[in-house]
Amino acid sequence: EWALLNFFVNEHLGDGYELILPPHMLNYECGYVAGQFPKFVEEDYWIANPTSADRKFMLPTAETALVNLHRDEVLTLDELPRKYIAYTPCYRREAGSYRAEERGMIRGHQFNKVEMVQYTTPEGSDAAFAEMVGKAERLVQELGLHYRLSKLAAGDCSFSMARTYDIEVWIPSMGIYKEVSSASNARDYQARRGNMKYRGEDGKLHFVNTLNASGLATSRVMPAIVEQYQNADGSITVPEVLRPYMGIDVIR
């Protein structure tokens, strides 16, 4: 897993992203700006009572912290786009996920993930989204995993997101594809909640666009590697891109 995380982070840094190590405990306002509250307030772990004045919740995804970095700020055109990544554990209650296919590493209350977030102008938003989807796809391709790219229907997208694509890897033992990355464009939804603007060439203030994508979640990538790379004798061939980090070619 550490080899995967190092591979992901190094790939993103090489593409011009800035690494952030955000806090794991956030206040209610962070969840509100990200578009997770009040609708999903019951899905997170709370340090204090959700209705108390000093309420804090555990980070469900690094996106929640990263989209609050420029809250109540005015950026310049020269500062856009801003590209951030963060590696964090993610903490989720996952209430109601009791199916057999959701056991073990596939869906846990704590898992590790590298997250990408961009702040862009509205004009650069679509290009940024295509870039982020392409980056997540490239990571899966470089690992040599069988996968598919799915565009979510409007009814399946979060209410705060204008567009979402999922990247899913094949899990042979389950006979299904499971999501390892979700890329979304919030347009100016989060920016309006967080009062995040930039000054345009016309001298006026405009809301930025925010985008996020997993790059990637390790808890589902690892089972996919184990199963797709397993040999007849039970050994596991290490994907070529991970060998410099692990120092071995085969796990026996």
Please name every model-derived segment:
Residues 1-252:
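TRNA-recognition modules of translation machinery and tRNA-sensing kinases, especially anticodon-binding
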